[in-house]
Regions:
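Conserved "HGTGT" condensation-loop signature of ketosynthase/thiolase-family condensing enzymes
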Residues: 1-106
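Active-site-proximal alpha-helical scaffold in enzymes
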Residues: 108-124
Length: 124
């Protein structure tokens, strides 16, 4: 995507960015709450069939990515880059979830800003 710098900290994008596909997955507890109908996938427990929290988080990210690519549709599901982050051990879960993809991975560690940071970087 072509960009143009406007000053030191502002970038104007030649074409507006868009989100081709998105998904969210949750554990049993969230699935029992008032937002249950809003989730794409609710696991039967919080472990996603795994034995550790790290493996569970990896499985959760892999499921969310697979669903997002599926919802994006043919052609849109091709990844050029993968931006992901988590709060667990400096992106361990994100790194392991991303290694199955055939594209460059950018690990983000921005705590609460990870989503906004990822969207901004991916737009460029």
């Amino acid at each position: 995507m072509t960009t143009k710098k406007l000053g030191r900290q502002t970038v104007a994008l030649a074409h507006p960015p868009s989100v081709a596909g998105h998904a969210n997955v949750v554990g049993k507890k969230e699935g029992e709450g008032p937002l249950a109908a809003c989730f794409d996938y609710i696991d039967v427990n919080d472990a996603f069939g795994e034995s550790t929290w790290e493996k569970s988080e990896r499985a959760m990210q892999q499921k969310a990515l697979a669903l997002a690519l599926e919802k994006a549709g043919p052609g849109e599901g091709q990844l050029d880059w993968l931006f992901a982050g988590d709060l667990l051990n400096q992106c361990v879960s994100s790194s392991f979830a991303a290694r199955e993809q055939q594209c460059p991975f950018f690990g983000l560690y921005g705590a609460c800003s990870t989503m906004g940071e990822g969207l901004a970087l991916a737009a460029m």
